[in-house]
Amino acid sequence: MTDELLPYDEVMANYEPVVGLEVHVELSTATKMFCGCSTDTDKDPNTNVCPVCLGLPGSMPAINGHAVESAIRIGLALNCHIAQWCRMARKNYFYPDMTKNYQTSQYDEPICYDGWLDVEADGETFRVEIERAHMEEDAGKSLHVGGSDGRISGASHSLMDYNRAGVPLIEIVTKPIRGLGAKAPQVARAYMAQLRDIMIALGVSEARMERGNLRCDANVSLMPRGSETLGTRTETKNVNSLRSVEGALRYEIQRQGYLLSEGRKVRQQTRMWQEAGEYTIAGRDKSDAEDYRYFPEPDLVPIAPSREWVEQLRAELPELPAAKKARLSSQWQFSEADMTSAVNAGALDLLEATVDAGCQPAAARKWWLTELSRRANEAGVDLAEVGMTPCQVAQLQKLVDDGTLTDKLARQVIDGVIAGEGDPQQVVDGRGLAVVSDDAALGSAVDDVIAANPQIAEKIRGGKVQAAGALIGQIMKVMKGQADAKRVRELILEKLS
């Protein structure tokens, strides 16, 4: 059952939303955070485990150096300060997903702190301040059996899979985001999108929200206009898409607005986002005073990255998405809308590689964001996995440019390339798809169509040359789209002049 909601504009008239985002990034390391177990969580349950990630007595952890390097690179990309000295801590809690009854995380000494990220939303640039980015391990996975929708409520029993326990995470926490007004959910979505693109550019994570590589907990409260007193916040979990981040925040803003308009209090609690119905439901009540009894991890030495190493990692950072977008937008003369659609489709690198292979930017964009994007969506794969390379797209466009193919024939060539029939030229040869420009073959078809359409032919003789389009269409149909339309038009006008 959904809650009563206050219209969004009414909420904005009286309240200022304050947003905070906690984002967990699953790192693409081969092994777990503190042991040598594989991070492949798709294996049979409880097969990628060992005494360390199960927390068995006497086991000793050792920190994953690759995870530390990834954390520093993330911090640098987010304009953070990198701690000269930090350490891990034990976050104590009791729940079946962590057998040792504590999570190894960081508390008051994160590896990265005080950063920022500029994001664009609705044609404006907003700065999101980042409080910290710290390292921690993931928990195991619960499977509740016998309940509804996999929830613990009504379940007869629960199963635990610890393959995920100990997988390296980076948690990125923003400072309270204020002053955005009605655009708060939109800016949060843009922040998540840019964060995802940065992780992919760095190569530290697959950053697939639908697969749990990138997980967001969205906090929001309402502050009365003209007041500096923060309202009671809720934390919405289970937000697994960019659209859901925006939708969950907007829903919570309207839900809280209704409660406050009725003189009721907002309860500080976790909420769960329901994707199907696009609403939140109550989880558990929370308190700012929750005591996890943090204390320094005694089994791990402190981390002290040298300044030389940090500066080396800074120098080796790849071009980040915002800089690449600005550079390519200028080079290609794309509109803001065109660049945004390319970024949102994850096509920027593909477009750049296609242009580097000799294709014009506009043509590269046309193929990747229309025909190939549609085929990728139908197949349920990423655009890069659709079955056609940037070089092949450039080859395809060259065949169009030199008159060998029409756009319609080129679409058939795409089908052939994806089906594994070879490069574009091989598909053209194998399927016999080249445009027919031979006057003898075209002339015969033109004569037949003129003879079959005397009234249209008479109009053309009378000076209505635009009527030639009807004859061209029939000829293209007869020749299965392979006729050179320009030459067909010339022949029609020559014969009827």
From Swiss-Prot:
- Organism domain of life: Bacteria
Signal peptide range in chain numbering? none
Q: Which InterPro entries match?
A: Asn/Gln-tRNA_amidoTrfase_suB/E (IPR017959), Asn/Gln-tRNA_Trfase_suB/E_cat (IPR006075), Asn/Gln_amidotransferase (IPR018027), Asn/Gln_tRNA_amidoTrase-B-like (IPR003789), GatB (IPR004413), GatB_Yqey_C_2 (IPR023168), Gln-tRNA_amidoTrfase_suB_CS (IPR017958), Gln_synth/guanido_kin_cat_dom (IPR014746)
Gene name tied to this protein? gatB
Q: Name one Pfam family in it.
A: GatB_Yqey
Question: What's one GO BP annotation on this UniProt entry?
Answer: translation
Q: Which family does the similarity line name?
A: Belongs to the GatB/GatE family. GatB subfamily.
HAMAP family (alphabetical): GatB
Q: Self-association or partners: how does it assemble? A: Heterotrimer of A, B and C subunits.
Q: Which SUPFAM superfamilies match?
A: GatB/YqeY motif (SSF89095), Glutamine synthetase/guanido kinase (SSF55931)
Q: Which SMART domains match?
A: GatB_Yqey (SM00845)
Entry function: Allows the formation of correctly charged Asn-tRNA(Asn) or Gln-tRNA(Gln) through the transamidation of misacylated Asp-tRNA(Asn) or Glu-tRNA(Gln) in organisms which lack either or both of asparaginyl-tRNA or glutaminyl-tRNA synthetases. The reaction takes place in the presence of glutamine and ATP through an activated phospho-Asp-tRNA(Asn) or phospho-Glu-tRNA(Gln).
Instruction: Supply the name of the protein.
Output: Aspartyl/glutamyl-tRNA(Asn/Gln) amidotransferase subunit B
What EC number(s) does the entry state?
6.3.5.-
Provide the catalytic activity annotation.
L-glutamyl-tRNA(Gln) + L-glutamine + ATP + H2O = L-glutaminyl-tRNA(Gln) + L-glutamate + ADP + phosphate + H(+); L-aspartyl-tRNA(Asn) + L-glutamine + ATP + H2O = L-asparaginyl-tRNA(Asn) + L-glutamate + ADP + phosphate + 2 H(+)
Cite the entry's keywords alphabetically.
ATP-binding, Ligase, Nucleotide-binding, Protein biosynthesis
Q: What class of enzyme is it?
A: ligase
Molecular function via GO: asparaginyl-tRNA synthase (glutamine-hydrolyzing) activity; ATP binding; glutaminyl-tRNA synthase (glutamine-hydrolyzing) activity
Keyword ATP-binding listed? The answer is yes
